[in-house]
Amino acid sequence: MATARRVARVAELIKREVSQILLSEIKDDRVGAGMVSIVDVEVSNDLQNARIFVSIYGDEAAQQQTMEGLASATPFVRREIGQRLGLRRVPTVVFLQDRSLERGSRVLALLNQLRQPAEAQQQEGSHPGVEGRMADTPGGEEDELSEQQ
């Protein structure tokens, strides 16, 4: 078992090297169909498995095509990682699509939709007379006290 520090360091090195490989080494046109960026790399504690999370910009067809290209390039990527990092055992590489950015933007859109009707209700519900009465309250109380005396 590797220490947590070593696992994190290997994950960061894999992330850097795979980014370079995707940028300049892979010749498969399917990988270039959508803009690919590596979001995160998770390496198991025994350094045997590496899950590479990628974010792909493009429509659904381009994303699917890019994932197919990455799947076919996996043996090449694994071999390159082994040569560049010099690890005794090269981790098995799996590319996974990270959809957290899509989910985050969808949540933000839903929040904006909820906020717009709430703001409209606040604008309709605010009455200028209410603010005026609140300002008059201290004076009104004094008038009542002076009348009672």
Swiss-Prot record:
Q: Which residues form a coiled coil?
A: none
According to the record, the residues making up region (Disordered) are 117-149
Annotated keywords:
Cytoplasm, Ribosome biogenesis
Q: What is this protein called?
A: Ribosome-binding factor A
SUPFAM superfamilies, from UniProt? Ribosome-binding factor A, RbfA (SSF89919)
Q: Per its UniProt record, what NCBIfam families does this chain match?
A: rbfA
Task: List locations, semicolon-separated.
Answer: Cytoplasm
Q: Which cysteines are joined by disulfide bonds?
A: none
Q: How does it assemble?
A: Monomer. Binds 30S ribosomal subunits, but not 50S ribosomal subunits or 70S ribosomes.
Task: Report the Pfam families cross-referenced here.
Answer: RBFA
A GO molecular function term, named singly, is: ribosomal small subunit binding
At the top level, the lineage of the source is: Bacteria
Question: What GO biological process term is on the record, naming one?
Answer: maturation of SSU-rRNA
Record-linked InterPro entries:
KH_dom-like_a/b, RbfA, RbfA_dom_sf, Ribosome-bd_factorA_CS
Q: Where is the composition biased (Acidic residues)?
A: 139-149
- Cellular component, GO, one term: cytosol
